Every structure is written in structure tokens, then in C-alpha cells.
Amino acid sequence: MLPNMQIIHYLSARKLKFMEEVKVIEIKKSIFEENGREADELRAELKKKGVFLLNLMSSPGSGKTTTLIATINAIKDKIKVAVMEADIDSDVDAIKIKEATGIESIQLHTGGMCHLDAEMTRQGLDNLSEGLDLAILENVGNLVCPAEFDTGAVRNAMILSVPEGHDKPLKYPLMFSICDVVLINKT
């Protein structure tokens, strides 16, 4: 046997010996597992209350807030709607929504995080008035992180603006695969 083969044989035999003496526990748990449970619970609670939660995502500057203002003004006399604005630190969009529509609009500061998860969404919902028909979560402007975290929303939507380029579905496939609706803006 070659010297290197002897070393490999020795190490393999040693590993087998220790494997018999040491109990090995394989832990294969998704880091998203707990959030998934929380999101499912939140969806069930919202369904009981008759609240439809929409998670709106896109990159910064695609027109989320402007589109929301136009949509809210078209529906606010028919249903009770409120908005949760998520941003790393700013409250500009929450103020803009409130001033332009007159509806309830709250700001969720993520403290540097580029997404919201189910627990963060719940905190926002707990601060909205009762009796809503529609709660809209305007997620942090980003095409990567928000797609990875289930917020507990009934539906996910995104806005894609034409100036961003035609390659976004290729660069960010997860975002496009989890969305129920994609709005094309700035055509």
C-alpha cells in the first residue's frame, strides 16, 4: 500500500471507530421554518377577521408609493384600507400616503434590515385600527431580501418599472416566482 493510501485507510478506520462511540445528530432545519409557521398563523388570524393582507414589493424608485396612492384613492370609499410602510429608517412614504389619501398609514422601521418577516408584519398589524378590509404592506425597496421572507400576506405583488431593464426576471427569479401579480410601471 502506498504511504498516502495508508494514511487515508488509517483515518477512515479511526473515523468509523469514533462514529461508533459518538452519537451524531443531523440537524437539518430551515432557518425560515419558524417564520413560516408564524406566517401561516397570521394568515389564519387575518382570514378569521376578514382582512386581506397584500405584500407589495419592488426595487427603490419603481413607483410603489405613487401606484398605491392612485389605487387607494380609487377604492377608499368602498373598503376600509390601511398601509404599513416599511423602510430602513425613513418615514417619507408613510407621510406621503397619509397626506395624499387621508387613510391610516404607519411606518415600520426595520433598523437596517432589508426585509420584513411575519413577526414584524404582526407588530405593524397590531398597531392598525380594527375593522380593516385591506391592509397593504409596502415592503422595503429591494428585489432580493423581501422575496425570501414570508410576511403572512394573502398575496404578494411586485412592481417592475421599465427603466430598470428587461433582465430583472433573470437576475431575481425568486421575486418573480413568489409574486401572484407583477405590475409593469413607467412604460
List the predicted regions and their residue ranges:
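Short, conserved loop/helix-junction motifs that constitute active-site signature segments
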Residues: 151-152, 174-178
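Conserved beta-strand/loop subsegment of P-loop NTPase cores
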Residues: 82, 157-158, 176-187
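Nucleotide-state-sensitive switch-loop elements of NTP-binding domains
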Residues: 21-44, 49-54, 62, 66, ...
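Short, positively charged and aromatic/hydrophobic N-terminal segments
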Residues: 3-10, 15
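The Walker A (P-loop) glycine that initiates the GxxxxGKT/S ATP-binding motif of P-loop NTPases
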Residues: 58
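Cofactor-binding loop segments of dinucleotide-utilizing enzymes, especially the Rossmann-like FAD-
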Residues: 86, 110, 161-162, 186
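Short, acidic/small-residue loops that bind anionic groups at enzyme active sites
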Residues: 83, 158-170
